[in-house]
């Protein structure tokens, strides 16, 4: 019997799950995508290993071990560990499962696609030549493979393309090609709780200094406590952007905080070129979508210091080409690498290493 293609398999699963099946139907996860599925069909329940709730939307909440044999399950785990979630479902006896990305794709817009994937499909359709340009930039084959797999996932809702990736956040921003010497000056742009700065110090104990940028007061207080045992850390209570100004900020999103017109908190932002006068040697940026504007505000440092850079490009698909366009527009003597640190759409980092 001929094996169905990934899209045909998803279409068949979608038709059965939302048809007149006699099988019990569940979703793994309690979130906006689980709600979207529940709005389209009468589910038999939800599955969640991490809640104490026993009921949601009037339906029972089960643990994985309680899922009846013969059931159908859609996994709505979509961010850091969707592969792990699917593997757990695949281990269940006589349970047919499918990831939400594929089911949403097969629904032909009856279910909302994960925004990162929908945005990538739109951006690629508008600027295919930009993505081809980026693919040709990379300094090694691994970067090209990472790019191809991430794009296959984003463009075709094909989670199988991510089977080569694991959740490796502890390695993020630090790769064998990112070499450190005594006296390094590190800029932690989007420092959050201080974890990345601590990882930098582990790898470069003879550093010169750290410039730590975190705009939310409560988070900065926690970071200062976390980093109190370390020397020569300059805490900047601002976000990084291209100019000095005050903006609204959504502070309720944890490490995914982002600039927002309806944000609950006012924050101050400024350009790195305005805030730091000493030469810097390594810049890390994870600014929840503000990376291109922040790069515009550090062109002097890029030109004069020729620092290593590690820049998150996953927040907006246009950043895959906008970030290298900005940096290489200042000076083009960089090797460019790409690495990915989760099983899903988050945590893709582009590196710029001086030639």
Predicted regions and their residues:
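Phosphate/nucleotide-binding beta-alpha loop and adjacent structural elements of enzyme active sites
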Residues: 1-41, 49-355
């Amino acid at each position: 019997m001929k094996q169905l293609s990934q899209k045909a398999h998803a279409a068949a699963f979608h038709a059965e799950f939302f048809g007149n099946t006699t099988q019990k139907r569940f979703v793994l996860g309690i979130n906006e995508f689980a709600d979207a599925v529940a709005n389209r069909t009468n589910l038999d329940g939800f599955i969640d290993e991490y809640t104490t709730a026993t009921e949601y939307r009037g339906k029972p909440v089960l643990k994985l071990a309680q899922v009846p044999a013969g059931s159908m399950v859609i996994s709505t785990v979509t961010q850091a560990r969707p592969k792990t979630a699917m593997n757990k479902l695949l281990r269940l006896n006589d349970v047919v499962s499918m990831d939400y990305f594929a089911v949403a794709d097969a629904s032909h817009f009856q279910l909302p696609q994960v925004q990162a994937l929908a945005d990538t499909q739109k951006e690629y359709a508008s600027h295919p030549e930009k993505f081809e340009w980026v693919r040709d930039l990379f300094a090694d084959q691994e970067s090209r493979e990472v790019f191809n797999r991430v794009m296959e996932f984003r463009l075709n809702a094909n989670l199988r393309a991510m089977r080569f990736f694991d959740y490796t956040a502890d390695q993020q921003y630090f790769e064998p090609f990112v070499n450190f010497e005594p006296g390094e000056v590190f800029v932690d742009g989007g420092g959050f709780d201080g974890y990345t700065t601590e990882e930098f110090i582990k790898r470069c104990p003879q550093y010169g200094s750290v410039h730590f940028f975190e705009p939310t007061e409560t988070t900065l207080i926690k970071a200062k406590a976390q980093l109190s045992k370390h020397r020569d850390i300059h805490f900047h209570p601002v976000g990084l952007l291209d100019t000095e100004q005050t903006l609204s900020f959504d502070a309720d999103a944890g490490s995914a905080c982002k600039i927002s017109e309806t944000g609950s908190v006012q924050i101050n932002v400024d350009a790195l070129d305005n805030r730091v006068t000493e030469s810097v040697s390594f810049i890390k940026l994870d600014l929840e979508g503000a990376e291109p504007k922040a790069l515009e505000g550090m062109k002097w440092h890029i030109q004069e210091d020729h620092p290593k850079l590690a820049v998150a490009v996953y927040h907006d698909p246009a950043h895959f080409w906008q970030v290298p366009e900005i940096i290489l527009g200042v000076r083009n003597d960089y090797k460019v690498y790409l690495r990915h640190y989760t099983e899903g759409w988050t945590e893709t980092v582009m590196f710029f290493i001086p030639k």
